[in-house]
């Protein structure tokens, strides 16, 4: 099937992008694999007129907003991120009325409608850098409260206001499981994603995005306790097969696992449904996405 997909892809001039959390076999046929920020940046540089996104819905939306002239397909249109819906436009409007000198910062894990009401987007790989550069004193970060809490510790000259959203995978990591792994493997370093709760991050030797965690594993050291979605192991073992990884809890995103080779082949054969974003919303949502790319500077 992989050979058929690559043949069809070449014939139809289609670029396949995949997030680190999708199954390894999907990552293997993708042209580009990375975290949310890398995929958003990469999409703006592609010459292909059609993009297939193996990830969750907000990723495809962001790519379509940044590339309105391209045809964008989700591998599974129902692969959604629950956290993206854990903030409302009403709440954002209330915060703008309550605070002067306020910037509304949205994690890229948000809907296009929410982005349209925000000032700048962030990802876990550039959040601290971007928030540090904002001129506003008050910063309302949506929708992820755990990421916002982490940023609060890193950017101390801002009044960061937290929302109550969370990642359904990272938020369920059990503290006792991480402690147990640390006791079992005392030489292993703990690498955690900032979507985890503070009690988990307090045990981490390194906190960073999926790309950051991979880079950290590829440095010195042989044993690592990984506190993020298990799909990340595919890229790590591809680059460093002898590293020993120990995962805290199950850590599987069911939405990411909806992306399959069968669905990709079907899109290449039949066309599939094109992802569309309302023109007015897309125009407004483009502003925070472009500001993110500008402030991230890489």
Swiss-Prot record:
GO terms for molecular function: 4 iron, 4 sulfur cluster binding; metal ion binding; quinolinate synthetase A activity. Iminosuccinate binds at residues 19, 36, 107-109, 124, 193-195, 210. Keywords: 4Fe-4S, Cytoplasm, Iron, Iron-sulfur, Metal-binding, Pyridine nucleotide biosynthesis, Transferase. Signal peptide: none annotated. One of its GO terms (biological process) is 'de novo' NAD biosynthetic process from L-aspartate. [4Fe-4S] cluster binds at residues 81, 167, 253. It is found in: Cytoplasm. PANTHER family: QUINOLINATE SYNTHASE, CHLOROPLASTIC (PTHR30573:SF0), QUINOLINATE SYNTHETASE A (PTHR30573). This is Quinolinate synthase.
